[in-house]
């Protein structure tokens, strides 16, 4: 509950800021206080940047990653392997894989996962577009990189069922013990996946 000691305009800003992920009322209040201390020029530049973000950023027409053009820079890059499509839940997942530098194919962002309890079904995701894209582009391999949550696993199995009759190799990213990790602190699910996904040494 926002303090009644602030003017209504500030209360409204704090309330709106506290809706952002990772921000509670205290953090939102600190940000609001900081905004008041900023120069008018800096505050207006920030407001302009938010307006630009909302008006110019859209999703790539091919993979549904964020972009300010018709296609994102990854889809437009001729050096990328067009035969591989890595399927991820969100743009944040795409960026995590990109930062690893371990993948040089293209992506497909589902924009979520199957979540029946939240009324999210196949028609709410970019699954139809994925199937059309595989057929249109003649992909050799689809790498399913959904998260190892129950929803991510359900989505992966649903995709596998749809893709099994298509002429495309389907793989799932491996999960295991992180580098520097300690087995005694690793959860049962991760240990099970690591053991099932073991490789010859």
Swiss-Prot record:
Domain of life of the native organism: Bacteria
Keyword hit for Magnesium: no
A GO MF term: DNA binding
InterPro entries for the chain: DNA_Rcmb_RecR, Rcmb_RecR, Rcmb_RecR_Znf, TOPRIM_dom, TOPRIM_RecR
Chain intervals annotated as zinc finger (C4-type): 60-75
Domain Toprim: 83-178
Keywords: DNA damage, DNA recombination, DNA repair, Metal-binding, Zinc, Zinc-finger
Keyword DNA damage recorded: yes
SUPFAM superfamilies reported for this sequence: Recombination protein RecR
PANTHER family according to UniProt: RECOMBINATION PROTEIN RECR (PTHR30446:SF0)
Name of the molecule in the record: Recombination protein RecR
Organism per entry: Syntrophobacter fumaroxidans (strain DSM 10017 / MPOB)
Encoding gene, per UniProt annotation: recR
């Amino acid at each position: 509950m926002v303090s009644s000691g602030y003017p209504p305009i500030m209360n409204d800003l704090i309330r709106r800021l506290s809706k952002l992920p990772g921000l509670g009322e205290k953090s939102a209040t600190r940000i609001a206080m900081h905004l008041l201390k900023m120069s008018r020029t800096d505050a207006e530049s920030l407001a302009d940047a938010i307006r630009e973000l909302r008006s110019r950023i859209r999703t790539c027409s091919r993979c549904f990653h964020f972009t300010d053009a018709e296609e994102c820079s990854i889809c437009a890059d001729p050096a990328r392997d067009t035969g591989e499509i890595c399927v991820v839940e969100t743009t944040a997942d795409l960026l995590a894989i990109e930062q690893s530098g371990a993948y040089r194919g293209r992506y497909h962002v589902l924009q979520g996962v199957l979540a029946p309890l939240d009324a999210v079904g196949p028609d709410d995701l970019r699954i139809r577009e994925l199937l059309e894209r595989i057929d249109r582009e003649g992909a050799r391999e689809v790498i399913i990189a959904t998260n190892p949550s129950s929803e991510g696993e359900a989505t992966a199995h649903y995709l596998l069922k749809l893709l099994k009759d298509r002429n495309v190799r389907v793989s799932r990213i491996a999960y295991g013990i992180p580098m520097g990790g300690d087995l005694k602190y690793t959860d049962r699910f991760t240990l099970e996946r690591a053991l099932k996904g073991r490789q010859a040494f």
